[in-house]
Curated annotation (Swiss-Prot):
Belongs to the peptidase M3 family. It is an enzyme of class 3 (hydrolase). It comes from Phaeosphaeria nodorum (strain SN15 / ATCC MYA-4574 / FGSC 10173). InterPro entries: M3A_MIP, MetalloPept_cat_dom_sf, Neurolysin/TOP_dom2, Pept_M3A_M3B, Pept_M3A_M3B_dom. PANTHER family: MITOCHONDRIAL INTERMEDIATE PEPTIDASE, PROTEASE M3 THIMET OLIGOPEPTIDASE-RELATED. One of its GO terms (biological process) is protein processing involved in protein targeting to mitochondrion. One of its GO terms (cellular component) is mitochondrion. It catalyses: Release of an N-terminal octapeptide as second stage of processing of some proteins imported into the mitochondrion. The active site is at 571. This is Mitochondrial intermediate peptidase. It is found in: Mitochondrion matrix. Binds 1 zinc ion. Its main location: mitochondrion.
Amino acid sequence: MLKRLARNNSSPWICSRCLQQSQRQRRFNSTFAATATARDHAPSALYGLSASGKTDDDALRKVFDNASFWESFKRGTSNKKPSGIIGNKYLTHPDGFIDFVTVTIQRCNGVVEKVSRAETIEDFKYMVKDLDKLSDLLCRVIDLADFVRSTHPNRQFQIMAVKAYHTVFQYMNQLNTTPVLYDQLKKASDIPEVFESWTEEERIVARILMEDFARFGIGLDDATRQKLVDLSGEIAEVGSQFVEGMSPETPTLKFESKRLKGLDPNLAKALTKWGETRISTMHHEAQAVLRFVDDAEVRRETYSAVRTAGSSTIARLEKMLKLRAELAQLSGYETFSHMTLENKMAKTPEAVNTFLKALYEDSRPSVLADLHELMELKRGDAHQDNFPNRMNAWDKFYYTQKMLSTMEGAYKQRTADSLSAYFSVGTVLQGISRLFDRLYGVRLVPQETQPGEVWEDGVRRLDVISDTEGHIAVLYCDLFSRPGKTPNPAHFTLRCSREILPAELEEMQHMPHRFSSPIEAATDGMSVSYNASRNSYFQLPTIALICDFSKPSSPRPTLLNIHDVRTLFHEMGHALHSILGRTALQNVSGTRCATDIAELPSVLMEHFAFDPSVLALYARHWDTNAPLPLALLENRLAIDNRNGYSELESQILLAMLDQAYHSNLPLDPAFNSTSVYHNTYTRFASVPEPAGTRWQGFFGHLFGYGATYYSYLFDRAIASRIWKGVFNEGRDGGSLDREKGELYKNEVLRWGGGRDGWVCLAGVLRDGKVGEGGEGAMREVGKWGIDAGK
């Protein structure tokens, strides 16, 4: 049951899109070479902010873009009372984790004891709240410790965070095998008076917890449950070995240097010795060969080597898949996919495959149209006699690059200034804040920190202020590069929303603690808000946004390329879900929702990033304050999205492969993952995959996203529908319409995971056809399609 509490938060929120893009492109943050200091342009009155709001709006840009302003802003910190990391008053020093863990386990033991001895109707009515509190207490340590161990630059803090993480994780696993928690929750659920007293949110959390208890073996005999535990551990170990040990069958290729015509001369020279060029199949030079080398046979050899994983890698993958199939059957499920999808919007693998096939059919004409253009290029290439009337897999990159090079050449001739000059970090965040204010009535306000509150000197704290509710969340922005920092953008929810009732404060009055008040003791000294209508406090969602942008080089700010701007909007979409999804119960707050709807807020935010009305809020030249020339951006986006349908086809094929691998096929003694891979590509790929390749050995997402790889495609289709149907694709001011923003907030965001995703979707689209979910609704979403050319 309590496994769930680490489901979305025990690791940073890094979506599949973020990982794919960071692997394809190491971010390049261009800076506009100029000697002038970034000017402080006064905020325009058109944004409709109050005087204080305008001051906050201006400060938001300056804390990121103006070095002298930031230094002055930080100085206010030194006069304040010391605080622990993110305001947690236990963590003023590394050893504070010891007290934090000790107190947490004491409080958890108290909750377990209370649940275990529940007898009366009133006791059982509080059962869900009590178990949710237990989840929250454990998550407070697990989530924060996991964040500190991966992000904090201080080695001693890292060491103590690792110890805290493992101690509490082990304690949590003990609770997972404690039948009394399951028995008491089931008893409470079976009492009509109790069940009817629960809110819809409580009923959903009860169902989630019951499903998770059952999934992890509670209710089974001891021997079977132990086998489940052992299988789960073995899957985790083999899966990690698979991801960490991925290697090609052929690590290096050798060619005569004269055969590499078309490759960048400097790169070719660096790779060549005594007339022989060595190409590593796991590094960027192999991709360069596929894109630029004229010799089709060299490209063919390179493609086959790049797409063929080693035998040991394939063996580890197949072992993981077989173990997962065994785990599912031992747990009473037909397949691992059935087990995984039970609590997702899709519900069944049949529904997922229905969605994928509908999406495949919708995208097929555009995929073939793009392929036809590449074929025309190949037919016009007088030097190619290699299958002249067929597009081969090793040709696609080469002719796509030729097409893009033509577009790039025309683009550069028209470009008088760098696009990045219009996208400083501060102006982009200022634009996001203005967008949030227009649509949802919330804005980002820079806040001085207390000594010890942030883990690195360059971290900025932004308070999220609602125009009706005041302070509603805290966002820490760790956006700039430093040694040892992960290059992957990530959204961490360090503390979730949860309602703290008067009864809990009463309990804290009778517990010894170091704090000045019961509410501080209940929240480890962190920020809360008071809800007068409910006479209760709410934990403020506390979020960390991690990026790896280049540091500003005074006097100019850090400037972002198009990919970085889109990434920042995407990650702020996750943050928005946490900010507005402030539920009473922690288990369903913010991003703690079904995996196949979790990416919706972030993907939808990408649609806003380059909408003309939204661009008018922020895209201005860092030095001259001139507005962005829209034609310049449109040309750049046309180039960046030119390969969109080819990439979409690739993602559909991988999602289909994921479902096939998590069906009952691995239970067959003759199971061969390579045969399944080639069968999938033979049936559906527009360009045939060469015989003998084994690319599935490089499909690392099979471990972390097993049976759910379709989710990002699913959310792209939904986001596209909402962008068109609710926000009118930005036309007629739709992207800034408060009424439309409130509709989306009230039907989707504010629920977190506390409402059925199909009901959310039907509400925001005002389309009852999809409200019931099921295979028919999945087919309908697939038919909506994805406009991959935008």
